């Protein structure tokens, strides 16, 4: 299910973050941390309500994106198809085109034979048509090139900020999510310059300074994701007590580690 897919992505990102923490490479961690936030919020949004429909919308969206890309690539006489033929050759392009058509047919069959997927697919079409009418009313261009995200289907959520509001994390949007975008869009390279008495120097690539804030953020949002999953699974009292002890232990370790990292900043 999609909630398990989210958990897998979160686990992969935490594993990558552990490697970077061990190396003292905190600057590149920001890229993964931002994605971790997106996955954590997405998981919470799915588990909050209408879980089956939202999970289905998330699962289907990736296939929709692949098919949209394939239709552009394999459209005969299009600029993209001409470039693909030059790169792959006519024979390989034709074979890949047939493979794409089989995938497209299989995906449509999956929707047609699954009641939940069919319901979500119909809701998606309605959402696209609704946005097209709105764009037409506002006289916007490219009304036939409507793109929607999985979280828009059957909800009033139109963007990631609104999804953060739905999950109670809107206060983090500007300060954390927006702030982390500097690393994503390569706008923070100048921060690696350190001014000292005798000139300017580049900081070390593996620099532990200011890592405490990133580490704290990773810990907090990882535990938030786990907490939401535990509540959704509705485990018995013994399991909940065990999880509570685990969280308390993590918090103690987090405080100790951050205090140690802050000492590095002071030095």
Where on the chain are the PLM-derived regions?
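Long, hydrophobic, well-ordered secondary-structure blocks that form the structural core
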Residues: 16, 26-77
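Secondary-shell segments that build the walls of catalytic and ion/ligand-binding clefts
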Residues: 64-215, 225-267
């Amino acid at each position: 299910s999609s909630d398990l897919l989210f958990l897998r992505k979160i686990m992969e990102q935490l594993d990558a973050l552990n490697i970077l923490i061990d190396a003292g490479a905190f600057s590149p961690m920001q890229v993964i941390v931002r994605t971790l936030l997106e996955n954590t919020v997405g998981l919470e949004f799915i588990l909050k309500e209408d879980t089956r429909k939202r999970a289905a919308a998330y699962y289907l969206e990736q296939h929709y994106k692949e098919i949209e890309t394939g239709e552009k690539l394999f459209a005969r006489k299009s600029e993209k198809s001409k470039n693909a033929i030059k790169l792959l050759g006519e024979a390989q392009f034709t074979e890949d085109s047939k493979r794409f058509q089989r995938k497209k047919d299989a995906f449509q069959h999956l929707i047609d034979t699954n009641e939940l997927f069919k319901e979500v697919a119909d809701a998606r079409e309605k959402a696209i048509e609704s946005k097209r009418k709105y764009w037409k009313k506002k006289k916007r261009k490219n009304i036939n090139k409507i793109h929607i995200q999985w979280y828009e289907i059957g909800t009033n959520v139109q963007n990631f900020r609104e999804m953060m509001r739905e999950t109670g994390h809107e206060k983090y949007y500007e300060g954390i999510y927006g702030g982390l975008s500097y690393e994503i869009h390569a706008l923070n390279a100048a921060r690696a310059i350190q001014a000292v008495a005798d000139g300017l120097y580049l900081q070390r690539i593996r620099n532990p300074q200011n890592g405490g804030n990133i580490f704290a953020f990773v810990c907090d949002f990882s535990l938030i994701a786990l907490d939401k999953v535990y509540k959704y699974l509705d485990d018995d009292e013994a399991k909940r007590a065990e999880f509570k002890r685990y969280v308390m232990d993590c918090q103690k370790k987090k405080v100790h580690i951050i205090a140690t990292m802050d000492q590095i900043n002071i030095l």
